UniProtKB/Swiss-Prot annotation:
PANTHER family: EXODEOXYRIBONUCLEASE 7 SMALL SUBUNIT (PTHR34137:SF1). GO terms for molecular function: exodeoxyribonuclease VII activity. HAMAP family: Exonuc_7_S (MF_00337). Keywords: Cytoplasm, Exonuclease, Hydrolase, Nuclease. Belongs to the XseB family. Its main location: cytoplasm. One of its GO terms (cellular component) is exodeoxyribonuclease VII complex. This is Exodeoxyribonuclease 7 small subunit.
Length: 80
């Protein structure tokens, strides 16, 4: 299932901000059922987008290490 084009174009920060707004509205319990379902679906798409962006960022992060002969070098960072 692909995400809507407007979500695909969002930065991590934009998607997270909208996701936080949706969560707050859902937690308030004030939205009608159909609106809540639509917000939940959009929230799920935003969450997936944020996870994808975070994974891409994680793969780009490198750590600086001392290579052979004391020269600085970089290698992929390991998380977990």
């Amino acid at each position: 299932m692909s995400e809507p084009a407007d979500i695909a174009a969002m930065t991590f920060e934009q998607a997270l901000a909208e996701l936080e707004q949706i969560v707050a509205r859902l937690e308030s319990g004030q939205a009608p059922l159909e609106d809540s379902i639509r917000m939940y679906e959009r929230g799920a798409a935003l969450k997936a987008h944020c996870e994808t962006r975070l994974e891409a960022a994680r793969l780009r992060v490198e750590k600086i290490v001392m290579g052979a002969g004391g020269a600085p070098a970089s290698e992929p960072a390991e998380f977990g």
